[in-house]
């Protein structure tokens, strides 16, 4: 008796998932644009404040790259989660809760993907 009620409640809860912030994808996209603009405006201040060895253009290109990395996401809840994480990163950067090494960690050269098959791992020297 109690088990069927729990099962019914679980099935009802799984069909009606409440979004985090955005009601639809258009609102989620608006939040992403706002975050992108905030990061874009903050790059010159960050470069100056942390005395980074990069230009403002390189910083803005990296911001664009980081946003384009998640351009394929279509679920509004996932987009909201990514926006929340981006706002937290922005706040930490603005308030100088990070050090220069934390900011420069974003500017490492893109790493080659790890090999998948045995021979490639052997040639590169990775453990299987």
Swiss-Prot record:
Coiled-coil region list: none
Keywords, in A-Z order: Acetylation, Electron transport, Membrane, Mitochondrion, Mitochondrion inner membrane, Phosphoprotein, Respiratory chain, Transport
Post-translational modification N-acetylalanine, affected residues: 2
Protein location: Mitochondrion inner membrane
CDD domains in the record: Complex1_LYR_NDUFA6_LYRM6
Modification Phosphoserine occurs at: 11
Main location: mitochondrion
Any Gene Ontology CC annotation: respiratory chain complex I
GO process terms (BP): mitochondrial respiratory chain complex I assembly; response to oxidative stress
Membrane topology: Peripheral membrane protein
Stated family: Belongs to the complex I LYR family.
Subunit structure: Mammalian complex I is composed of 45 different subunits.
Record function comment: Accessory subunit of the mitochondrial membrane respiratory chain NADH dehydrogenase (Complex I), that is believed to be not involved in catalysis. Required for proper complex I assembly. Complex I functions in the transfer of electrons from NADH to the respiratory chain. The immediate electron acceptor for the enzyme is believed to be ubiquinone.
PANTHER family xref list: NADH DEHYDROGENASE [UBIQUINONE] 1 ALPHA SUBCOMPLEX SUBUNIT 6, NADH-UBIQUINONE OXIDOREDUCTASE B14 SUBUNIT
Protein name: NADH dehydrogenase [ubiquinone] 1 alpha subcomplex subunit 6
Organism of this sequence: Pongo pygmaeus (Bornean orangutan)
């Amino acid at each position: 008796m109690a088990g069927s009620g729990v099962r019914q409640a679980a099935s009802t809860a799984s069909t009606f998932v409440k979004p985090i912030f955005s009601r639809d994808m258009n609102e989620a996209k608006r939040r992403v644009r706002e975050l992108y603009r905030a990061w874009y405006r903050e790059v010159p201040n960050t470069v100056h404040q942390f005395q980074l060895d990069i230009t403002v253009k390189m910083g803005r290109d990296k911001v664009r790259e980081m946003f384009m990395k998640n351009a394929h996401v279509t679920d509004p809840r996932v987009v909201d989660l990514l926006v929340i994480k981006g706002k937290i990163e922005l706040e930490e950067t603005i308030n100088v809760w990070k050090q220069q090494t934390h900011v420069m960690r974003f500017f490492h050269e893109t790493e080659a993907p790890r090999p998948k098959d045995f021979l490639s791992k052997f040639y590169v020297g990775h453990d299987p």
